[in-house]
């Protein structure tokens, strides 16, 4: 279990919060110096998401409202979610990022319904509000228990035919702790196990293509 890597929970969360307070509020900052992969990432995410938005019949996922978790300055909100949804809510632990988002998003930012400044371990989505809850590059900042609990709360936040998407780094064998930003990169089988523990069913899994060889494999998981 990856939580064995977390010796002190308070320190685990506090160290991460301090790390992000010192990151510049830019796309490059959000991506740890890999701002150049943003377009490839967003194009892959759009393709993955649209298979649910374009489904025929009664299983189609709606496009009224999405939630961007660990939203930062709004990189995903701006380029992926606002073009596809009528309203987007954003949640992030760093107040400076959410303040920057208001200028970064430009005119379309008027369609952001709520800016929530909160750690995901303490955040509860409004029940029955969201068609899509997008959780990218942030589950490593939650312990296993807090991730399972957060996913359970997210499930309650979904509208009919709504989905939760996790997109994150994974390893193929053992989970790895990053002491710099205080995060865990989990093995892929553990991610699947924690999703199942939360009472969710995986609908689709896809590896992001065309990323640099030196970074971890990145997978998207859709579930409800």
UniProtKB/Swiss-Prot annotation:
Pfam families: Methyltransf_PK. GO terms for cellular component: cytoplasm; nucleus. CDD domains: AdoMet_MTases. The keyword Nuclease does not apply. It comes from the Eukaryota. Keywords: Methyltransferase, Nucleus, S-adenosyl-L-methionine, Transferase. The keyword Isomerase does not apply. It is an enzyme of class 2 (transferase). Its EC number is 2.1.1.244. Coiled coil: none annotated. GO terms for molecular function: histone methyltransferase activity; N-terminal protein N-methyltransferase activity; protein methyltransferase activity. Belongs to the methyltransferase superfamily. NTM1 family. This is N-terminal Xaa-Pro-Lys N-methyltransferase 1-A. It comes from Xenopus laevis.
């Amino acid at each position: 279990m990856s939580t064995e890597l977390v010796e002190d929970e308070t320190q685990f969360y506090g160290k991460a919060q301090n790390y992000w307070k010192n990151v510049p509020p830019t796309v490059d900052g959000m991506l740890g110096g890999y701002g150049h992969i943003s377009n490839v990432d967003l194009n892959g995410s759009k393709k993955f998401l649209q298979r649910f938005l374009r489904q025929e019949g009664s299983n189609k996922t709606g496009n009224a409202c999405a939630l961007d978790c660990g939203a930062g300055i709004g990189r995903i909100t701006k380029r992926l979610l606002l073009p596809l949804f009528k309203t987007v809510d954003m949640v992030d632990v760093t107040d400076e990022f959410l303040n920057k988002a208001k200028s970064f998003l430009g005119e379309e930012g008027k369609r952001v319904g709520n800016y929530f400044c909160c750690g995901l371990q303490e955040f509860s989505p409004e029940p029955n509000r969201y068609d899509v809850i997008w959780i990218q590059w942030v589950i490593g900042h939650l312990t296993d228990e807090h991730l399972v609990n957060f996913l359970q709360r997210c499930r309650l936040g979904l509208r009919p035919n709504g989905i939760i998407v996790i997109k994150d780094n994974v390893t193929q064998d053992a989970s790895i702790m990053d002491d710099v930003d205080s995060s865990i990169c989990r093995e892929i089988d553990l991610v699947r196990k924690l999703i199942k523990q939360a009472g969710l069913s995986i609908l689709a899994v896809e590896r992001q293509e065309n990323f640099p060889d030196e970074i971890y494999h990145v997978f998207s998981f859709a579930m409800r």
